[in-house]
Amino acid sequence: MGRIRQTFIKRTGEELIEKFAGKFTSDFEANKKAVEEVARISTKTLRNRIAGYITAKVKKMNA
């Protein structure tokens, strides 16, 4: 079983995927940089969690 992510992380990740779909890939490191460019995230931990959620979502869409 995986970890349950907070609603804020899911909502923010899905909004970013909708607005900037072409910027995100299945590479976590690239997604960290993309999240930093397109959104004002206050902490590194939050940025990483959102980037991780986006990475997992993109991998599921491509599978």
UniProtKB/Swiss-Prot annotation:
Record's protein name:
Small ribosomal subunit protein eS17
Q: Which UniProt keywords apply?
A: Ribonucleoprotein, Ribosomal protein
Q: Which residues form the signal peptide?
A: none
Q: What are the recorded GO MF terms, alphabetically?
A: structural constituent of ribosome
Instruction: Name its GO BP terms in alphabetical order.
Output: translation
Q: Which stretches are annotated as coiled coil?
A: none
What organism does this protein naturally occur in?
A: Methanococcus vannielii (strain ATCC 35089 / DSM 1224 / JCM 13029 / OCM 148 / SB)
Q: Which family does it belong to?
A: Belongs to the eukaryotic ribosomal protein eS17 family.
Lineage, top-rank taxon, reads Archaea
User: Has keyword Protein biosynthesis?
Assistant: no
Q: Which Pfam families match?
A: Ribosomal_S17e
- GO cellular component terms attached to this protein's record: cytosol; ribonucleoprotein complex; ribosome
